[in-house]
Amino acid sequence: MFVRDHLPRRSHGVARTLPDQRELVAAFGGHPSDTGEDHPLVAWARALAALHRQRHCDPLAAAGIDCRRAELVATIDKWVVEQLLGKRPVDHLRAESLGATVDRMAAAHVHASHLLHTAEKVSDARVHAAWYRLALLADEWTDLITGGVRETVRGRRPA
């Protein structure tokens, strides 16, 4: 999980155009990119994670935060349409909202990180389950950007 060279460099250049799961997970944790240059999607991923952290700390501000998250999801999806869909044969990207996937990954990362830092034992089943869910979403991201189709143990994609 989250290995640097995990993504195959195929799928009509899409894998090279979009950040891989490792870059997104690093962004969710607030880490800078390896190259020092942020891909726009990495910057938006970092912003989504910050909004999820803010939402956790200030539940009364949830409505405004959720509106901003929706704006970022729409921005990501618009960027994908403008930058990728018109230029390359990437039909597999049309079926899913990449912005919504990044938002779900950001929420899962923030939740897993919170549990890791607040649980009495890091071996707590809830901590493991939260990180496992993030791994499933990271795999979903990889499948979306490479055109793969992966099923979970139960035969369905993670929510």
Explain the meaning of each model-derived region.
Residues M1-A159:
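Anionic, Ser/Thr-rich low-complexity intrinsically disordered regions
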